[in-house]
Amino acid sequence: MQPNRVYFGEVVDPDTGKMLDRALLIPFRAPRSYTGEDIAELHCHGSPYLLRRVLDLVCRLGARLAQPGEFTMRAFLNGKIDLAQAEAVADLIRARSEAQLRSALALHTGALSQKAQSLSDALLSLLAT
């Protein structure tokens, strides 16, 4: 499979041969992923029963469920995002208003980090003179 391409296919239980769903699979290769690691996304329909069946199947086949915040932690540890951006992910998830959403997006896109870096550069320049 080529990374960063979308594949459409059937999710089939190998034990029964029965199709569970039609789904999209997107493989990502390090470092070109959110976490900076090899990863795959599986997109299937949203029925809670169906999702439970698909998750049970992929776990039986060797996958495991991620812990809350695990992908963001891995992205931070692998240098894909900085601490302000990592905290902004939690803010995005918790946003309950337009103002909260805009604030979290500004942090997530690196606006605060860029301003902090500019201030740091200016201070270092002053200290060097």
Write out the residue ranges for each language-model feature.
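A glycine-rich (often HGG/GG-containing) alpha/beta subdomain
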Residues: 1-102, 106, 110
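An accessory alpha-helical subdomain
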Residues: 103-126
